[in-house]
């Protein structure tokens, strides 16, 4: 199902492989869904307008808030961007904290994220962010409550709201829109005919557009994800696989093909690949059956969910976001205002 949706939403990535019949079918489906997309567009625009004119209340926290988000469904590089911001702010004397929804975790109220907590209790992305940086972090459906809890229990002077672009109840000082440079805005339609959560007009309202890979255009900030050495998912005495060794690659992220392509470009010998749903909950039996005795290479986001049952020949590939000094100055200058 997800593969079919990707062909509908991101047709440019499949032009070389799909038949004329399939292309026509996708166009018909898109046209049939357009009335629902128009309704969705009206609802989202009305909702934002209600906050803008004050009918719906927007609450501000007593510290600057940086919102990191996107207007497309699926992965774009928000988590590496959040980690980059945490490290940037710390280098310049700030004490950042992070708030997030905690996707896939059902609980009431808010919850502090600690490095010792399992991904199933806080969400894979919060577990990854805190595991990498140790930053104070609170998750909760209500971002205002999460922010207030963060300020009450931790020494924080700037808050990063992960995936918070559409959470208009929380006031913000800086808005960052993260965009997959290969997929960009897909077919340009709103849900369900396309991948957009909001119209393209939203791009002009943010403080900066960060483009992850692909081609950026004038006014956008190019970001690259730089891989480092393989790391074991759990404690291991084994050596990581060499480039000519056969491995199996898995990814449960918004754009798994980007990860597989990065491994191929790095020279790894992929004996098999398996793309899972974003935020996939893994089990030992499934992955063991998939790879047999071969090493597995996965993303860091996947690794935080596999540590309790990982084999010694399971590895993950850390990546670090790289942005320009112009982007750094933009963030720091806006915080000083």
UniProtKB/Swiss-Prot annotation:
It comes from the Bacteria. One of its GO terms (molecular function) is ATP binding. GO terms for cellular component: plasma membrane. Keywords: ATP-binding, Kinase, Lipid A biosynthesis, Lipid biosynthesis, Lipid metabolism, Nucleotide-binding, Transferase. Its EC number is 2.7.1.130. The keyword Iron-sulfur does not apply. Transmembrane segments: none annotated. Pfam families: LpxK. ATP binds at residues 72-79. It is an enzyme of class 2 (transferase). It catalyses: a lipid A disaccharide + ATP = a lipid IVA + ADP + H(+). One of its GO terms (biological process) is lipid A biosynthetic process. Pathway: Glycolipid biosynthesis; lipid IV(A) biosynthesis; lipid IV(A) from (3R)-3-hydroxytetradecanoyl-[acyl-carrier-protein] and UDP-N-acetyl-alpha-D-glucosamine: step 6/6. Transfers the gamma-phosphate of ATP to the 4'-position of a tetraacyldisaccharide 1-phosphate intermediate (termed DS-1-P) to form tetraacyldisaccharide 1,4'-bis-phosphate (lipid IVA). HAMAP family: LpxK (MF_00409). Belongs to the LpxK family. This is Tetraacyldisaccharide 4'-kinase. It comes from Shewanella sediminis (strain HAW-EB3).
């Amino acid at each position: 199902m997800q593969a079919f949706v990707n062909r509908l939403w991101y047709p440019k990535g499949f032009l070389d492989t799909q038949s004329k019949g399939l292309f026509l079918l996708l166009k018909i489906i898109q046209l049939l869904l357009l009335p629902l997309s128009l309704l969705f567009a009206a609802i989202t625009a009305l909702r934002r307008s209600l906050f803008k004119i004050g009918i719906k209340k927007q609450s501000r926290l007593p510290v600057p808030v940086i919102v990191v988000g996107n207007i497309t469904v699926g992965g774009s590089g928000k988590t590496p961007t959040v980690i980059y911001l945490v490290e940037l702010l710390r280098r310049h004397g700030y004490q950042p904290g992070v708030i997030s929804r905690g996707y896939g975790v059902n609980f009431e109220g808010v919850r502090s994220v600690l490095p010792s907590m399992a991904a199933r209790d806080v969400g894979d992305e919060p577990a990854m962010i805190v595991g990498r940086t140790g930053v104070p972090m609170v998750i909760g459906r209500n971002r205002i409550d999460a922010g207030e809890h963060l300020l009450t229990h931790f020494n924080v002077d700037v808050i990063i709201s992960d995936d918070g672009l559409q959470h208009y109840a929380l006031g913000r000082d800086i808005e960052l829109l993260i965009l997959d440079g290969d997929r960009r805005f897909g077919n340009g339609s709103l849900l369900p005919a396309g991948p957009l959560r909001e119209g393209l007009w939203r791009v002009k309202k943010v403080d900066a557009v960060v483009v992850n890979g692909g081609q950026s255009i004038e006014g956008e900030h190019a970001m690259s994800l730089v891989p480092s050495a393989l790391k074991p998912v759990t404690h291991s005495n084994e050596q990581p696989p060499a480039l000519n060794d056969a491995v199996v690659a898995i990814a449960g992220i918004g754009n798994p093909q980007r990860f597989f392509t990065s491994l191929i470009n790095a020279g790894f010998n992929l004996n098999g690949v398996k793309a899972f749903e974003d935020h996939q909950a893994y089990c030992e039996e499934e992955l063991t059956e998939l790879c047999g005795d071969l090493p597995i290479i996965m993303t860091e986001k996947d690794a935080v969910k596999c540590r309790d049952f990982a084999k010694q020949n399971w590895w993950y590939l850390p990546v670090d976001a790289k942005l320009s000094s112009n982007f750094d100055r933009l963030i720091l200058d806006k915080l000083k205002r």
